[in-house]
């Protein structure tokens, strides 16, 4: 090996050593507080080294990417669905589609176990599993004309597993959408500032869509500046309106009202043309997403804050107040999207491969965008770990866990305001005492002061992770840019997350509608027509109706639906990732590259162990701490049967809990059947092709890139 080659690797070796040293500090320092900077530097080093070496190994050895091969976008260039797109524009488009609420919420919830377990899983998971899955699916789909995950399973393994996979993907999509919507509802309930700001984004996006289409076509920079100025104005005026004696109470809505508004919004937006609301919303969201995360990272570099949360808390045994479940397997399910997420397999097949200009871009987009998303998750974990742990637990523990009943903040503007303020003080004192007794000392004054700082009546009962992240963002941005108060930055954070999530809700409902039309089209061919308005309305109504039902159940559930839906969301999401990795393994076997299947088999096996174990516990555990579905249902049925002095409301609440648990149990069993039947068919396929010495995969024939090169579009 010549010296030139060796010298080329020296900077990377140094970077690797720096990363390893920072990780060692994060992992091994005990008892003293350390700076959040260690985590940021360690993560960036890990991402860069993994991208430089591991993703290159996969691209060159496992996939053998071919720069001379024409992609589906080049072959079918129709200016509509198939468009060869600039790799940086496509990176932004793909990142906006995959980075929903998962990387924001999961890590915040996982912080109840301390910052260390989450950090290690986010780094190891993304390098070995998450980015591999995204890259693999994108590669396979781009060699099959941009086929969707279900279609590829049908082609490579047969029609039965194909239909099962389509059905499974659709079910998982419904759960993901319900969870995303629930997070928006929790963030906007009883918050007039949030409601005004988030509602303003709809006319802003519509205006941007019309501006780009008719007034000044193609002026992306111009319209983005206008959009951002209008966004900032809407945050500022939201604060003015929230403190207005008339408009404040008028825009304070209960969670059920917001639920119905969201369902209506999603239904309409999924039927509107893409250019009108979805595309401009994506632009706004991508600017905001990458801007805020980079801003947060720079803020942490400037402020060098210390991590207040311990490296590991006492809750690794599964007794935590936010969610139940021990470190293994539940940490690996709570943090889905930053480490590995099956939802991405639905984006990496279907949409993104139809826009790929050159096959070699798949590494940058498939592997690279997932690393970026993992960084978003790391920043969320850091934001949750630099605020006071006592405040973190007070905000995220459901009221029942704190032993309190929240007063009706709805009447804050009315004549009962003094009574409600007094009740709020009592409740806060009780909550502070409870959290302090767990070893995370906090005073009622600190909790009330935080609420006052951020311009909200209270910070209690703010589960779902979004408000905690917004407080973390507000802490950092307010210290770096003190001219705007904490309230502005907090609502900026909430808006950032709601936009993040609404983008996913819009896009998800739209692809959910296509999936449902695909499924139903097998029985009623007319419904397959995506350009028919009637079929579109039926598909959208079915999709929105299903996630809307789960969302409503979650909102009215006194135990907080996110608690029951979140583990299901994590488990189903990881199962879908396992299915995608099984497909990757089958394709490698059929391509006669069996020596490389460890790349997909190792993460697939790990995900299957985690998800099956977690589902087994959630279904059959009789440990009251675990809140197993069947156990909880039987407990509440018993309470209803034996309860003599129960009010009608209590009985209705208990019946809700019983229905929720049976729904979740039914869905869990369905997922197990879906995943294991696909593994069975994968195994069957392997047995069928193992003795053939020719390739048996269904790759489309090689077409060379046209001689004049490819005309690349820089906007999509």
Swiss-Prot record:
Main localization of the protein described in the UniProt heading: membrane
Residues annotated as transmembrane: 6-26, 31-51, 89-109, 120-140, 164-184, 192-212, 223-243, 258-278, 283-303, 327-347, 375-395, 485-505, 532-552, 569-589, 597-617, 669-689
Claim: Ligase is one of the keywords in the record: no
Protein's membrane topology: Multi-pass membrane protein
Catalytic activity from the UniProt record: pyruvate(out) + H(+)(out) = pyruvate(in) + H(+)(in)
Periplasmic side: 27-30, 110-119, 185-191, 244-257, 304-326, 396-484, 553-568, 618-668
Domain of life, source organism: Bacteria
UniProt KW keywords: Cell inner membrane, Cell membrane, Membrane, Symport, Transmembrane, Transmembrane helix, Transport
Single GO BP term: cellular response to starvation
Signals that turn on the gene: Strongly induced at the onset of the stationary-growth phase. Expression is dependent on the BtsS/BtsR two-component regulatory system, and on cAMP and the cAMP receptor protein (CRP). Repressed by LeuO. Monocistronic operon. Regulated at post-transcriptional level by CsrA.
Cellular component annotations (GO), alphabetically ordered: plasma membrane
Molecular-function annotations in GO: pyruvate secondary active transmembrane transporter activity; symporter activity
Pfam (any one): CstA
Chain spans, region Disordered: 696-716
InterPro entries in UniProt: CstA (IPR051605), CstA_N (IPR003706)
Regulation: Transport is inhibited by the protonophores 2,4-dinitrophenol (DNP) and carbonyl cyanide m-chlorophenyl hydrazone (CCCP), but not by ionophores such as valinomycin, nonactin and nigericin.
Subcellular location: Cell inner membrane
Record topological domains on the Cytoplasmic side: 1-5, 52-88, 141-163, 213-222, 279-282, 348-374, 506-531, 590-596, 690-716
Stated pH dependence: Optimum pH is 7.5.
Record's function text: Transports pyruvate with a high affinity and specificity. The process is driven by the proton motive force. Under nutrient limiting conditions, mediates the uptake of pyruvate, thus enabling it to be used as a carbon source for the growth and survival. Part of a nutrient-sensing regulatory network composed of the two-component regulatory systems BtsS/BtsR and YpdA/YpdB, and their respective target proteins, BtsT and YhjX.
Subunit structure, as described in the record: Interacts with BtsS and YpdA.
Family per record: Belongs to the peptide transporter carbon starvation (CstA) (TC 2.A.114) family.
Name of this chain's protein: Pyruvate/proton symporter BtsT
Species assigned in the record: Escherichia coli (strain K12)
